[in-house]
Amino acid sequence: MRAEIISVGTELLLGHTINTDAAHVGRALSALGMDLLQVHTVGDNAGRLEAALREALNCADVVITTGGLGPTDDDMTKETVARVLGAPLEEHKDSLRRLREYFGSRPIAANQLKQAWLPRGSTAFPNRAGTAPGCAVPGKPGQWVILLPGPPSELLPMLEDSVMPFLQRMGGAVIASFMVRTFGIGEGSAALRIADLTEGANPTVAPYASDAEMFVRVTAKAENAEAAEALAKPVVDAVRGRLGDVVYGVNVSGLEAVVVEQLRQHRRSLAIAESCTGGLLAKRITDQPGASEVFGYGLITYANEAKTRLLGVPEEQLACYGAVSPQVARSMAVGVRERYGADYGLGITGVAGPGGGTEEKPVGLVYVALSCSNAVWLRVLRPQGRYLGREWTRRLASSHALDMLRRHMAGLPVEAGWADGLPQD
C-alpha cells in the first residue's frame, strides 16, 4: 500500500515547532511495510490543505493528516477532509460521550463540542491522552484518509492503539517487523554488505542512520504472525551475519538498555565520571528499568579541582597534559571505579564546543576510557570534517562509552575502530 503524510500547522511550516509527528508516522508505516511516497507540510490554510489533500489522493491508498483537529478556528482539517470526500460532518455519539467524561462536571464550551463531529462514515479512534478523537474516512474503494491529532503525546498512543491495527486489517496481512540495531559502522558500509538483501519484496530490508547509529528494519507480511516471523527471521539472521559484532541487538530500545541488562546478568556494577557530556551518559543509564541494581555513582567533574578532589586525578597530570587528554580520561575512569567501589568505571573528557577548541585540541575531540580491575581501554573521537554541534558530540561520546562496556562484557575487542571515516581509535 502507498501512503502520504500531510502535516498541518503554521508553526511547523515556519520551523517554530519541529515536526516529530511525520517521523513517528513514517516509522509506523515502515513497520507495516507500506511505501511512503511523500510528506507535505501546510500551514493553517484550508485552501492549501485542500490542494495538498487532492494531490495526495491522486497517488496514495492511505493519506494520513496530523494536526488541525482541536477546538479553535484554525483547526480545520476535519472540515476540509469532509468537503473533499463529500462526507459531511455528523455528531459522533461515542466521541461526544468521551468528551463529556473528560470534562466531568466542568462546563464544555461550544467550540469544544465540535471535536465530537466526524465526517460521515468514519471509523473513530479514541484519544486517551486528550480531547480530539482521530478517525479514518473512506475515499474511493480501497482508499482511506486518516486524521490524527497534532500533539505527539496524543498521536503516539493513537498510532499504537488504533491506527496500526486498523491498517493491518485493511492490508489483509499480518506484519512482522524486526529492527537490527548497530553501533560502529556507517550507513554506506552497511548498505554495501547487505545490498542484495534490500532487493527483496517480502521481506523488505531498509537501512537508515540516526543519532550516530545505523539501523536495519526487516519487515515481512503473511497470513498469520507465525508465518510472517518465519519469513523474516532468516533475513534478520543474514543481516546480523553480514554486519558482525557491530550489531548490539534486535528490537531493543538502545545501547543503554543492552548495557544495563548485561550488567545485571553478569552481576557487575558501574560508576561514571563525566566532563564534557555533562551527565548525559548517567541519564541514559538511569532511564533504564533496573538501573539502580547496577549503577551507584555518576559524577560530573567539570572543573579540574573536582577531578582531583572527587576522582583523585593528579594535579601534576592536569598541569602537564591538560584536562582534555588520554591520561586524564584514564585517571577519571580508574578513579571513579576505585573510589566508589564499582566493577567498571567510565570516564569522558573532551571539547564539546562550540567554543574552547585549539589547533592542538580542536572542537569535537573527546577521550573515552573504560576501567576494570586489571585493564584500562581508551577511544579517541577526533573531528571528521565539519563540526556537527555540541549535542551531537555529547551523544556520540556517550554512545562510545556504552559500546566499549558492551563489547567488553560480550568478550569482543573494546578498542575496535569505526568504518566510513567516522571517529576511531
From Swiss-Prot:
Disulfide bonds: none
Cross-referenced InterPro entries: CinA (IPR050101), CinA-like_C (IPR036653), CinA_C (IPR008136), CinA_KH (IPR041424), Competence-induced_CinA (IPR008135), MoaB/Mog-like_dom_sf (IPR036425), MoaB/Mog_dom (IPR001453)
Top-level taxon of origin: Bacteria
A Pfam family hit: CinA_KH
SUPFAM superfamilies: CinA-like, Molybdenum cofactor biosynthesis proteins
SMART domains assigned to the protein according to its UniProt record, in alphabetical order: MoCF_biosynth
Sequence similarity: Belongs to the CinA family.
HAMAP family listed in its UniProt record: CinA_B (MF_00226_B)
Record-given protein name: CinA-like protein
Organism per entry: Desulfovibrio desulfuricans (strain ATCC 27774 / DSM 6949 / MB)
